[in-house]
A protein has these predicted regions:
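AAA+/SF3 P-loop NTPase mechanochemical coupling elements
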Residues: 71-77, 115-134
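Signature of the SF2 helicase/ATPase Hel1-core->accessory helical subdomain module
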Residues: 103-110, 131, 139, 157
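A short, charged helix-loop
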Residues: 1-3, 154-167
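Conserved catalytic/switch belt of AAA+ P-loop NTPases
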Residues: 54, 97-123
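Conserved AAA+/SF3 P-loop NTPase catalytic/coupling segment centered on the Walker-B
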Residues: 80-107, 140-147
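P-loop NTPase catalytic core of nucleic-acid-dependent motor ATPases
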Residues: 1-87, 98, 151-154
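Short glycine-/polar-rich loops that comprise or flank the Walker A/P-loop
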Residues: 78-80, 127-130, 145-151
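A short helix-turn-beta junction within AAA+ P-loop NTPase domains corresponding to the substrate/partner-engaging
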Residues: 142-160
Length: 167
C-alpha cells in the first residue's frame, strides 16, 4: 500500500501479476508504467512477480535501457517480460516517437515481431511479452489521453530508508 495506495490500481496490478504468472505464454495487451521517486522501491515491489514468471535467474526477462530502445537488435522481444528501465525521453519531440516505437511491442496485433540478432537472419517470434516500464521522471513519454495501451501509475512514496531497503 505504500507504493500503490489506490485500491483499484493495486487490484489491477495484482490481476496482471496473477494472470501472467498463471498464463505466461498469453499476451497482456497493455503495458504498465510505474513511476515514482528514485529509491522508493518500485522495482522491489515487482521482484516476486518477476521471479515467479522468469525463474530465479530471471532468464526469461528482457531488460532494456534507453539506449537499447533505439537499437536495431531485438533480443528482448524473445522474453516473457520486457522491462524498460528508467524510461525517459528528454525531448518532447522524441517522446511521441518513443511511444510509436513501443506500440507494436505493447499490444497485439501484430501477432508476430521480427527479432534481429547479430550474425543471424532475422526471424519472427510470437508477440506475447508483457511490458513493464519504470521511471523517476514525471513525464517520461508522451501518450494520448485515450491510449489504452498503457496503465500508468505514479507512486508518491518517499525514498526508502537504508534499513527498509535491506529487508
Amino acid at each position: 500500500r505504500r507504493l500503490v495506495p489506490d485500491e483499484a490500481e493495486l487490484n489491477h496490478l495484482w490481476d496482471i501479476m496473477a494472470f501472467k504468472t498463471q498464463n505466461p505464454r498469453v499476451k497482456i495487451n497493455h503495458a504498465v508504467l510505474h513511476g515514482g521517486h528514485g529509491g522508493s522501491g518500485k522495482d522491489t515491489m515487482w521482484a516476486p512477480f518477476l521471479w515467479a514468471v522468469c525463474g530465479p535467474g530471471l532468464v526469461n526477462r528482457g531488460l532494456v535501457d534507453g539506449d537499447s530502445l533505439n537499437s536495431q537488435w531485438g533480443y528482448a522481444l524473445e522474453s516473457e517480460i520486457i522491462i524498460l528501465n528508467e524510461l525517459k525521453e528528454p525531448e518532447a519531440a522524441t517522446r511521441r516517437a518513443l511511444a510509436n516505437r513501443l506500440k507494436p511491442i505493447i499490444a497485439a496485433p501484430p501477432e508476430m515481431l521480427t527479432v534481429n540478432r547479430k550474425g543471424l537472419h532475422p526471424y519472427d517470434t510470437v508477440n506475447r511479452a508483457f511490458v513493464l516500464a519504470f521511471s523517476n521522471d514525471p513525464v517520461p513519454i508522451t501518450i494520448s489521453s485515450d491510449d489504452r495501451r498503457w496503465f500508468v501509475l505514479w507512486s508518491q512514496a518517499p525514498i526508502m530508508a537504508e534499513a527498509e531497503a535491506k529487508l
